């Protein structure tokens, strides 16, 4: 997994114009631009998709509004802060990427051979977005060094979730639950060396708990150690109700997802009138 961390001024300006205002000065600037140049302001709304599809090469059809924002003293200050933020993100990633890539490969049991452009915008915008049609992530979220692993794990989660969108299946909840188990829970636990299995969406909690015993088998946890993991993660089940499926420890994540989907009636109690087989694009 390779990350290219960049600042795209057009994307930064777009978010300043269309997200909640980061300051009173920017709010007043937006109001004035809308009052005086409503047509031009509205016309650049479509640019976001175009920027994300080619962040290094994007050139707007009409740069009038962009130039108006760029010439303001308020923007120049925000641009400087965004450049500083980019350097902070780069430094944190450079110091930790080896550890994250190694642990991620162990968990996936396959190489996540992908490259992403990480477009950083001002951290006060509080934005983390992934575009399903591109390999681009937009990040504008405060980075506190003592909480860097939370930040980096969330970035990795967004990337893996985006990659798993290539899996063609109607059972998205199962894929999303396994993504959380992998990244939000197990990867974060390994990185911080303390259980993070209390994290995740409430809507996925029941599915995750039903998958959890099989996930331990996938991780290669010996049945004799199940109790230790249950105590660690505060997720409990009757060990005697589960046959240990030893081959799960030898398959990769895509095969594991396929196994859970095919076994969803017995594991999750979900019936399907049609055969559900995953296909990776």
Where are these regions (language model features)?
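Active-site recognition of the HExxH zinc-binding catalytic motif
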Residues: 150-169, 180
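Short acidic, S/G/P-rich loop/turn micro-motifs used as interaction or catalytic elements
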Residues: 125-127, 143-146
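Charge-rich, solvent-exposed alpha-helical interaction surfaces
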Residues: 25, 29, 88, 92, ...
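Auxiliary, metal-adjacent structural segments of Zn-dependent hydrolase domains
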Residues: 73-133, 190-196
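Short helix/strand-bridging catalytic loops that position acidic/His residues to coordinate divalent metals
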Residues: 136-145, 164-173
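Post-HExxH zinc-binding segment in Zn-dependent metallohydrolases
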Residues: 1-37, 170-229
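N-terminal low-structure segments adjacent to metalloprotease catalytic domains
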Residues: 1-79, 84, 88
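Pan-zinc metallopeptidase signature
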Residues: 206-281
């Amino acid at each position: 997994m390779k990350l290219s961390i960049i600042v795209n001024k057009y994307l930064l300006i777009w978010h300043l114009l269309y997200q909640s205002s980061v300051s009173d000065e920017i709010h007043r600037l937006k109001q004035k631009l809308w009052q005086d140049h409503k047509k031009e302001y509205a016309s650049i709304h479509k640019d976001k998709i175009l920027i994300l599809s080619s962040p290094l090469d994007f050139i707007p059809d009409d740069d009038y509004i962009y130039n108006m924002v760029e010439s303001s003293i308020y923007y120049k200050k925000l641009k400087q802060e965004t450049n500083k933020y980019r350097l902070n993100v780069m430094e944190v990633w450079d110091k930790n990427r080896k550890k994250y890539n190694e642990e991620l490969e162990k968990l996936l049991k396959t190489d996540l051979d992908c490259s992403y452009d990480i477009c950083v915008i001002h951290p006060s915008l509080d934005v983390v977005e992934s575009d399903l049609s591109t390999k681009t992530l937009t990040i504008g979220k405060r980075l506190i060094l003592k909480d860097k692993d939370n930040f980096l794990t969330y970035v990795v989660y967004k990337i893996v979730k985006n990659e798993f969108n290539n899996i063609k299946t109607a059972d998205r909840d199962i894929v999303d639950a396994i993504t959380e188990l992998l990244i939000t829970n197990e990867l974060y636990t390994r990185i911080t060396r303390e259980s993070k299995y209390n994290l995740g969406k409430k809507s996925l909690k029941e599915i995750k708990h039903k998958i959890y015993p099989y996930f331990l088998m996938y991780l290669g946890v010996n049945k004799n150690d199940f109790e230790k993991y249950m105590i660690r993660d505060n997720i409990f089940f009757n060990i005697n109700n589960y046959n240990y499926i030893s081959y799960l420890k030898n398959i990769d994540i895509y095969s594991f997802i396929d196994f859970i989907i095919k076994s969803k009636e017995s594991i999750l109690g979900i019936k399907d009138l049609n055969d559900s087989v995953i296909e990776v694009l």
